[in-house]
Design a protein with these regions (language model features):
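Short beta-strand-plus-loop segments that form exposed binding edges in beta-rich domains
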Residues: 62-65, 131-138
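Bacterial N-terminal signal peptides that target proteins for export
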Residues: 1-8
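Post-signal-peptide N-terminal segment of Sec-exported extracytoplasmic proteins
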Residues: 39-71
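Exposed low-complexity, polar/acidic, P/S/T/G-rich flexible segments that act as propeptides
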Residues: 77-81, 137-163
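An anionic, turn-rich surface loop/hairpin at beta-sheet edges
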Residues: 91-122
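C-terminal motif of bacterial Sec signal peptides marking the signal peptidase cleavage site
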Residues: 15-18
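Bacterial signal peptide processing site
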Residues: 20-23
């Protein structure tokens, strides 16, 4: 029994780590064209319909961009065209402060990753598609490399997970 106790104590953290509650149920990015994100370019995310119906989720928007992005913010529309009635929300993302220091994570010369909560949404059986469109005055945004969404069970968003 004395041999078993130290072994059990050493193994306990591994057992507990396996019990972590991962609340993320969907997390995907779409790559933006290297020529830029055109206003007409809709980034679409098809949700597996059997998993997400009639639940409330925290929606999070993720962006990856370079220093070539010319603005400190980004306006986007979050569209759920199959929702009844169709839903469209506008979101303002502040990517840099007034002095030009980028928010989010990244190194100083290549790629930055930014996450922002976009509110709670309840998905119905018809909600199988979420779309992102930029609403900036410029018809083509250079420097945005990827945009994505994350759906998590409400009350437990972990923006550090699954980078």
């Amino acid at each position: 029994m004395k041999r078993f106790t130290p072994l059990f104590i050493m193994a306990m953290p591994f057992f507990l780590a396996g019990c972590e509650n991962n609340a993320t149920v969907y997390h995907q990015y779409r790559t933006v064209s290297p020529q830029g994100w055109e206003r007409e370019d809709t980034l679409s995310f098809v949700l597996p319909d059997s998993t997400f119906t009639e639940h409330c989720y925290q929606l999070e928007i993720g962006l990856r961009h370079t220093e070539n992005y010319a603005y400190r913010d980004l306006w986007i529309a979050i569209i759920r065209p199959h929702s009844v009635p169709p839903a469209c929300d506008t979101l303002h993302l502040e990517l840099a402060d007034r002095k030009g220091k980028w928010h989010g994570e990244g190194n100083s010369s290549t790629l930055y990753q930014f996450h922002a909560p976009a509110g709670k949404i309840t998905l119905s059986h018809a909600d199988t598609l979420v779309q992102l469109v930029h609403l900036m005055a410029s018809p083509c945004l250079k420097g945005i490399t990827d945009a994505g969404i994350r759906l998590s069970l409400t009350g437990s968003v972990n923006t550090q997970k699954d980078k």
